[in-house]
């Protein structure tokens, strides 16, 4: 959900892209540290760490940075932070529900950053539980199509018996949805079938979506961008639905 550099002015676009790249690297490194701390530094016995490292590699995070993150997380090297996961709930423009996942070593700073981003961009924080019920914790695997002749049936055939609930064609990728507890089985089934995937992680999938026109989408994307720019924010999950026609109009604007 990060990106949307189209909202930046041309003058500042490169600086924005560079900053977002650095932010993306920092997020991925945090994920590796936490995975190593939780399940140990051996990827053969820690599928969460394996997936975090694979995602970092695909995003071109330097190997040295990855190795150091594993060592910090597993305790083999000093310097790891005491990361805590905090989830904030809120509403954006047009009543779009938001879950904001933070990974932070300072709860007060994270709360202030999220609250400021919300209030300055037409959003508001909500009481715990008032938004979360609109989302389900799911396993989400993204499979790139580039350089392959994979079909939706190929992917479905590989994962059907592993607990996959849905396989959808997203244009440049296929997306496999499962229960979060079946994520490892789906990932292993894809490996067994020789199908490479771009990412495999637990996510929050909305049960009901709010359709947005161009004006509403512009406001919601700006809020998501502002949240995304907060140092402690790892992920933003939202229940909006923007049609292909609206997205095309925004990209041409």
From Swiss-Prot:
The keyword Transferase does not apply. Keywords: Cytoplasm, DNA-binding, Transcription, Transcription regulation. Gene3D superfamilies: 1.10.10.200, 3.30.70.980. It comes from the Bacteria. It is found in: Cytoplasm. GO terms for molecular function: DNA binding. Disulfide bonds: none annotated. One of its GO terms (cellular component) is cytosol. The keyword DNA-binding applies. GO terms for biological process: regulation of DNA-templated transcription. It holds the Pfam family Transcrip_reg. Its main location: cytoplasm. InterPro entries: Integrase-like_N, TACO1_YebC-like_2nd/3rd_dom, TACO1_YebC_N, Transcrip_reg_TACO1-like, Transcrip_reg_TACO1-like_dom3, YebC-like. Belongs to the TACO1 family. HAMAP family: Transcrip_reg_TACO1. PANTHER family: TRANSCRIPTIONAL REGULATORY PROTEIN YEBC-RELATED, TRANSLATIONAL ACTIVATOR OF CYTOCHROME C OXIDASE 1. This is Probable transcriptional regulatory protein Krad_3057.
